[in-house]
Amino acid sequence: MRPLEGITVLDFTQAYSGPYCAMNLADYGARVIKVERIETGDQSRFWNPYAANGNSGYFAVYNRNKEGIAVDMSEPEGKEVIKRLYGKVDVVLENFKFGTLDKLGLGYEEMKKVNPDIIFASITGFGQTGPLKTNTAYDNVIECMSGFMEMTGFPEYPPLRSGASVADSYTGLTMALAIVLACYDKKRTGKGRRIDVAMLDTMFATIEDAVLAYALTGKEISRTGNAKPREIVPYDTYYCADDFIA
């Protein structure tokens, strides 16, 4: 038996951070029901690499082990389907733009009417309460605004994005942990909760001591290539006769 068996998640997410979160929950045994828009579906269905049959390998990997339905949530019939599902699941996970489910009449207050102890988990770029809450964001925007790009690369070149979508993946893992903790707490207290994980907050938490260094010294950590900007030597990549070595 896998550790999350018995937990059911209604997954409204698309692209990467949310599906990656739900994928991890499904891998550990949660039943994940993925909800997509009719006709278009998840935008990552159109992301490469593609399999020989023309389907997106990207979508297949990050949405493995999930069940799927397509619902038009703008129609009354679609809203009723979603409300019935609210009554049968433990967790709702979404990464819509701020306020989208509320505008559809399917927000947290509606969830609690049919399932008072539900866990409602929201991933956004900038959270549910701040001045940027209505802004949308992709990984590169968050890497830039968090200072991650300013720290990455060589000093003689412009700031550099990570080779992988680290803001998305870190956020997905952070939310997965938050959901597991909320489920554990619900077993003790019988109460659900609302979870708010912002990509920007997550990246601030992952840039190690950059924020701390600025708070203590007023100095910004600059780009140092592959060297460690601390008193650790040797810590770099070095070109040797046959290739690089770290």
What are these regions (language model features)?
Residues M1-K191:
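N-terminal helix-loop segment corresponding to the beta1-alpha1 unit
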Residues M145, M149-A246:
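Acidic, glycine-rich segments within the central catalytic cores of soluble metabolic enzymes
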